[in-house]
Amino acid sequence: MSLAAPKSIKPKDWQSRGNPQNLLGHSIFVVDEGPANAPVILLLHGFPTSSWDWNLIWESLKKDYRLIALDMLGFGFSDKPNRRDYSIHQQADIVEALIKKYQLKEFHVLAHDYGDTVAQELLSRQIEENGAGYWLSCCFLNGGLFPETHRALLTQKL
């Protein structure tokens, strides 16, 4: 028995599946697919990529879940302001604005790499009871979970 590899789609085809949303004054690209009444998975991409990273698992997951993925500020099809420092706190603020705009009450979080760090900030807000929505679960993939041991690449520091 062999398993066929998932079929990848081209970034321009991925772009046609999403829409820009005005979040905190920025145009943020968002893909929202799957059954409207299904459990929600919020997907946070890594560095230096975009929501397109999720395309290989998208079709399989969207059969049973409503999937919402955004391109964070400065990435993918979202705004890339010049002369701008991108902070984890700002990215978390944008994700929370999305959660509020989409009126997400509860959801799962799937985060990768840079998205892990953003998710950690969001999780901290949850613990302090001032975060948006309610997390059902969280999965961190390949990120710097422990700041004291994380060694960012030179390109991540620039």
Q: Which residues fall in each region the model found?
A:
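The serine-hydrolase catalytic nucleophile loop
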Residues: 47-58
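A short, Lys/Arg-enriched amphipathic alpha-helix followed by its capping loop at the start of a domain
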Residues: 56-65, 101
